[in-house]
Amino acid sequence: EGNVGIPWYRRIFGLSSSTKHEVVKDRINTVRNDVLAFGTIPEVSQLIAPETSAPTQTVESAALDRAAASVVEILGAAEQCGYTSTGSGFVADNGLVVTNAHVVAGVTSPVVQDSRGRTWPGTVVYMDTEQDLAFISVPKLPLEPLTIGTNATAGSLVTFMGYPKGGPFKALPATVQGIGNTQTIDADTGRANAMRQVYQLAADVQHGNSGGPVLDENGNVVGVIFGKATTGQTGYAITASTLKQALAEGGDNTAAVSTGTCRK
C-alpha cells in the first residue's frame, strides 16, 4: 500500500485569546483516512507518474504577489485529542476560506490568521472528508477572494502557497507530474471512499501546507494541497474541478456543521 496525503499537526497546548501558541512538540498524525492506495502498487511515487525533483525555478508575477495576501493560516484546538492543528487556507469568496477537512477535524472554533498576524474567528460551514475539503465562514474577513481556474496539465510549472511547519508564509514552485483518480481508505471501516481526482506534484510540501492553494502564473487557483509522500519531494493536491463542484454544493452555506472527530 502506498502512503501519501498524511496530514501533519503541530501539537500545541494553551491556546490563548490572542492566539499566541506555545509549541510543545511536533506530532505526525498517521490518519489512514488520508492515506491513498492505488491497486497493489507499493511505491507512492508510482501512484500517478514517476517522481522528479522539485523545481528550483520560481514563477514571478504581480498576480501571484497579489494572491499571496489572500492565503491564510488556519489554527484550531481539537480538544478531544489534546492538540491544536495548524494548516493553510485561502479566500475563495467574500468571507469564505477553503482548507482541508483534516485540518479542521474535531475543531469547533477555528481561527484564521493572515500574513500580517491579524486574526479572525471562523465557523466551519462545509465538511467533505471524502474529498478532504472544508469551508470556513469568516464574515468580517477583509481579504480579496482568489479566482478558481481550470485544471492544470502535466508538465505545468505552478506555485503553491501556505504556512509550512506553522509558518512563516512561503510561496514555492512545483511541477505537475500527473493527474489521476484514486481512493481514500476510511480509517474506521477500512472501506474505500469515493474516487478522488488528484495531482501528483514535484514539490517540497511540508506539514502545515495542507489546505493551501496551488496557483498558475496568473494567480488562479488550480488545486488545493492535501498531502505528501512519505519520502522524497512529492506532494498531492485536489484539482480545481473538484473544488468547483464543492463550492457549488456548499459555497453558500452559513450554518455551522459538524467537523467530526479528530484522530490521535
Label every PLM stretch briefly.
Residues 5-90, 109, 248, 253-264:
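N-terminal activation segment of mature serine protease catalytic domains
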Residues 64-67, 91, 127-129, 151-153, ...:
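Extracellular/periplasmic catalytic domains that process cell-envelope and extracellular macromolecules
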Residues 68-75, 134-145, 170-263:
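Active-site region of chymotrypsin-like
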Residues 78-83, 94-170, 254-257:
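Conserved active-site neighborhood of the chymotrypsin/trypsin-like protease fold
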Residues 83-86, 106, 206-210:
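Short, small/polar residue-rich loop motifs at catalytic or cofactor-binding pockets
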Residues 88, 94, 116, 217-218:
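Residue-level recognition of short loop/turn positions
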